[in-house]
Amino acid sequence: MRVGLVANAYNEARFLPKFLKHIPDWVEEKLVLITDPPWYGDKLEDDGSKVLAENAGAIVLKFPWPNEHDQRNAGQSYFADYDWVLTIEPDEFLSNDDWRKLHDFLLTADKPAYAVKQHVLWGKGYESDPPEDFVPIIVTRPTVEFTEKRNVNSNWTTLPDDIKIWHFAWARSDEEIWKKISHYSHAVDFDIKDWYENVWLARKTENVHPTTPEAIPRLIKAKLPPELEALNLWPK
């Protein structure tokens, strides 16, 4: 079974080296795609992601992809000869146990695409309760195409409930959050300045998701698996 991994990266220098090093050896090759310039917003100063990724053993491609799905599809093409493509972002982590379960599941998996349930992490030490309903597609056959953001052109289902990711989407400093929301693919879907000032900086704890507030109804203390806690992934 040949498995490759694709990660889209822009301004993810804090997460990227730790993310790449936590990927198990059964993933044959790691590909990091860096869009330059970003999909939205002004170009940021180079944060060194390319060098960091290469030092962690990844192949890096830089290109001015106009949107998220075109960038993801570049990864699909790169791994055309593989059995599976894992499309996981630099702020999405699996525990050792979840990696093992994912490997064993893929040995007999028969669907073209799989999404995963997630712990959505916030600030320093918190997560959404209950978990966000959105399930990102992270496993596909290389023939599957992304059509918009993380949507695909094939049927898909969800991985077994005991396989989850720990998504550090909102586990960032004030500066990191502003850079994220002003450049990512949802930057045109909400008033970023209003949300940043009146939700994020106001330190609200209920109904805080930027595009669908009720998707993160409240925050509770998070308890990471020990191996992820040891990576020091929370912001300072």
Spans of model-derived segments:
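Polar, enzyme-active/binding microenvironments
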Residues: 1, 80
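Acidic donor-binding segment of Leloir-type glycosyltransferases
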Residues: 21-62
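Short, acidic/glycine-rich phosphate-metal binding loop used to engage nucleotide
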Residues: 62-68
